[in-house]
Structure formats: C-alpha cells, structure tokens
C-alpha cells in the first residue's frame, strides 16, 4: 500500500475512489506520514480561517496546507481546530544573485521562495456564539491567538446562516459577514468589560496586561485613548458607548480581516462577489476564490499529473483518465479563464504582506557567498514587520545574537547597515556579533 504510485493521489478529489486509495490514505493518517520536517525558525504568523458553518473553511484550509481536515455538507464538521502550514510566496533573491539557494526553513520553487505560515481552521460561528451557542466559546478562544483573519463567505448563496444546504442564490451573502462581525464585536466588548472591572483603580498598563492574550499591546490602547479622548487612568470610568467603540477599534486594529468569497464557479457568484465588494471592499478587501479547485490542482501537481504555479497549469502526464481531463478543463474554463486564478495564493499573500505588513529578509553569515557557516546559500527566509531594523532581525534569529550584536552588513552592497536604518524586503543581511 505504501508504495502505491504517487500519480493516483489526484483521485482523492474524485467521488468514489478505489478501496486501495482509501486504505492508503487511512494508513498515512494513522502513521502521521509527513514529508515536511523542516525547522521553521523565525516563523510565528498565525492566520485564522473563520466563517459560518459549512461555508468551505476546511476545504480552504486543505487547499492552503494540503491537509486532511474533515469536509462535509453539514454544519460543524470541524469540532476541534485544524492546524497546518501554508506557504506565502515571494521572489527569491537567488535568481538575481545567480546562486542556487539551499532553503532550510522554507522552500524555493522556480525562483519563488515559499515562506511557511501557520494556519488555523476553526469551528463555524453562528448567531449567539459570544453567549456560547454552537461552538462559540471554543471558536472565539481559537481566534484570540491569531494575527489576522480570513472571513469566508459562500458566494453561491447555497448554505443558510446555520450551515444547512438551501436553494442556490437564496442566502444573503452579506449576512455571512454581518453575523461574524457582530459576534466578534460582542465578544470583544464582553472581554473588555470583564477585564476593565479587574483593572478598576489600576493603571492602563495593568489593563493591557490582562488583554495580552488577544495580542493587544499598550500601543493599541494608547491609540484608542488618544482618538476617543478617553481617561487612561481609569478604564472602568469609560462610558458604555466609549467602551463599545474602543473594543471595536481594537478588534479591527489587532485582528485585520480579509473576506474570501468562496465557490466562485457557481451561478450566483459574480453577483454576490460584486455585492460583497460594494459593501465591504474598501473596509476589508474581497478576494473571489475557488477553494475546491485549488485543492484539486495542488493535489494533481503534487502527484506530478500537472505543472501548477498557483495561477495556471499544464497537463504533464499523458493518457490521464477522461474524467480527470474533463475536471481539469472545467476548472480552466470556469475559474482560471474567468477569474485569472483560484485566488487562494493571492489571498494568503495579501494576508501576510498587506494586512500584516510583513517583509522577507535573508540572514547569512558569509556575505561573499550569501551563505551560512555550512555553505548553504540563503538558507532562511525571515518574516519581519515592515520598518524593522537589524536589531529586530538579530532578535528574531536568537535573543543572544541581539544581545551581542555589533553591527549588520548588506551582503549585496558589501556595506555596513546603519544602526537606525530600516531593512527592506528581500534584503540579504549579515549580523556581526561578539560571539
């Protein structure tokens, strides 16, 4: 079973796969077979996929991670959160350096560096979740640790607000978003109220410490105090409406959202995507996606049946079964030709590089050969907040390196980097230290 030809893997995406495929998949899950044991240093971004029940969250998760999250056409298929690794993409500097890279904490495919990103697929959220309805309490706790949110809407309008199948086009896609927003804001307000009571009579720094589990910082609180002209000495004294507005602003600031309009190959998708863009485009951004098509293409690519670059594909295996060729032609016509791509990779890259404002920097020890001390060229791709300096890069690699840092060198220019200089995207940097 374990020596089953790899090109049969695409049959996973087909109905009624043969018994030996199911057996192979079962064995691989039980044995936890994995081909990715890389040491992912410097990678700490977490993206949460949220939405109502049965909107396609687990399919998107699987498409991003090539995971095996349960997928079914009924509510609350996901009970425990699924965790996995997806890969954001950036052009790798090895191309213009004319050196072959040797990635350690990432991958490189045809000149594109793939940087690992943590992804979380959580249980579907329904109205009343902040009061514990459905999987509400677990859902909101899972979201707390995330850095940004992909909010999934069903562009086909074929699932109701509770996740039950309904007549395509009958569900109002705007309500997919409104309910989630309402529940998030209600939950944040409740958290603020409870912790404001705990911080009664204390400094705002104490309030910030109580909210740190939501990745809320003192800078965030100072921001909201300033724009709403609130009293920083006593959070408990804030008026009810001020508390509500403050918690909403903090939620939007610390958990940026992008909307993914899923199932764009459906009859009503184009109308619903336009509707979402009209109401939410300026505020959140809306990405039309086809998660199931992305999953099928990635599995076919993994098995060597097609060559897929995240946008377009070409068939590389001769004599494919007619049903598979037909499925691929349908994806090409209904998704790629119409929408330009499945939208999934663009969605992930938007989260990392736009919503979270990250850049990629490549630390090396040998600035002549752009390598580490083992001679590996551009081994690590490190994500940093745009505006970071060399001391931030040193700390991301190891706290001791930051402590003993002397200076940094731009490996391409062979010039020392000023202490207060801001690093730029794609920069190759050597950190010089006393150790």
Question: What name fits each language-model region?
Answer:
Residues 35-133, 137-164, 169, 174-175, ...:
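Conserved G1/Walker A P-loop phosphate-binding module
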Residues 8-11, 20-25:
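Short hydrophobic targeting helices and cationic amphipathic motifs
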Residues 376-388:
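Short, contiguous acidic and Ser/Thr-rich linear segments
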Residues 433-435:
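Short, charged beta-turn/beta-strand-edge "cap" motif at the junction between a beta-strand
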Residues 138-288, 294-296, 304:
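Conserved C-terminal guanine-recognition region of P-loop GTPase G domains, centered on the G4
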Residues 266-362:
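Canonical P-loop GTPase G-domain recognition
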Residues 406-422:
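Short acidic beta-strand-loop surface patches of small beta-rich interaction domains
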